[in-house]
Amino acid sequence: MAILGITLVALTGVTNEKAADATKDALSSLNNSLIWMIGIAIIISRGLLKTGLGMRIGYLLISLFGKRTLGVGYSLALADLVIGPVTPSNTARGGAIVHPIMKSIALSFDCDPEKGTEGKIGKYLSLVNFHSNVITCLIFITATAPNPLVVELVAKATNSQIQLSWGTWFLAMVVPGLLAMLLMPLVLYFLYPPEIKQTPNATALAKEHLAAMGPMKREEKIMLGIFLVLLLLWAGIPEMLFGVKVDATATTFLGLSLCLLTGVLTWEDALKEKSAWDTIVWFAALVMMANFLNKLGLISWLSDSMQSGIAHMGLGWEAGCALLMLAYLYAHYVFASGTAHVTAMFGAFYGAGLALGAPPMLFALVMASATGIMMSLTHYATGSAPVIYCSNYVTMTEWWKAGFIMSVLEILIFGTVGILWWKVLGYW
């Protein structure tokens, strides 16, 4: 579909009457640095799987904190959080790294949906597995693919006056995000209490897996070092200490180069990471179309129409923007892709909020938060959802109930603690 979209823009001349210029327009977003940052970061994240570092981190945390079911839940959440910054594919992170750990623990307690024993521990851990994945996506730009698209659309809507860097995003989201991560396992524990409360088997199982893995291999140590370098550079530490700024995309290319030079990854590994190349292509198509929808006036027209409708209701910008945010967030019930949802709705809704008089930075962060929160709603809301759901530990009704309750909790957290924190930071 992405290739079809690029082809149609080039052939129809909808953006430019000159054929050559129309083709340039169709391919214009392939030089977008944010797109390459997310694509290359997905390739780097393959190193967590290939070296086994991601699994080791997960089992290590469970061996330390897994004596109780609640502790196992927090360990899974912390594992997702720790590897989140360098895993833009939340499907890979939640579905291919954390979920197998969760399943092995559940099965060690004879918790098997085929036997009707999913309530022992698996239902609770599955929901923690998923919702920790979603909250991690809120905290880091590089934790899921739609986030860079949000950054791009905010910059376009404000004529580049607001450019959310990796560090700015992290600083804004870390306090409300960590609070949400802290409360989430507790809320789910009371919502769907596991039958098994004590889990000494979990720590023993984790230690067995760690023993089987042996001491950290050379590749794991190198991957861990690259991971730390990326975090330091993305967070802007060199600029703070030495006044040397390193571009976020350049940092990502540095990470991939180090992976290739040290042998942690080969170029064959990079080529086999199809999701990265898919992301670059369809992301480029979506960003290109979003840009030209804005340039051709459609987004402005939709924004003005919504602003006019809200103004006729007699609402101030605060209530109007709250209404826009809620409509945008819960519209995700009819979307199976976060990126498609952002492309279709974010620009118009953000523009309408600005037209109502909302502070641009404040509303950007509110809408960015909503973009993450909406992924918690359904079993098809984001890529990791069907992977975890299809393990059959949770019914659809239970999944949707938990998703709605968590969305309300996260809206309250980001709408109170988040907004106050952003005020302290001087973001509005």
Predicted feature locations:
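Membrane-embedded alpha-helical segments and adjacent helix-loop junctions characteristic
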Residues: 11-113, 273, 277-356
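Alpha-helical transmembrane segments of multi-pass membrane proteins
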Residues: 38, 70-84, 110-136, 163-172, ...
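Membrane-core helix-loop-helix motifs of multi-pass transport proteins
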Residues: 109-194, 385-418
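Transmembrane helix-bundle signature of multi-pass membrane transporters/permeases
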Residues: 43, 78-81, 97-104, 129-137, ...
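Hydrophobic transmembrane alpha-helices of multi-pass small-molecule transporters
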Residues: 1-37, 157, 161, 167-304, ...
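In a subset of proteins, long, contiguous C-terminal domains/tails are tracked
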Residues: 347-356, 370-428
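Re-entrant/interfacial helical elements at transmembrane boundaries that shape
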Residues: 91-107, 126, 139-158, 201, ...
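Hydrophobic alpha-helical transmembrane segments
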Residues: 3, 70-75, 126-127, 170-174, ...
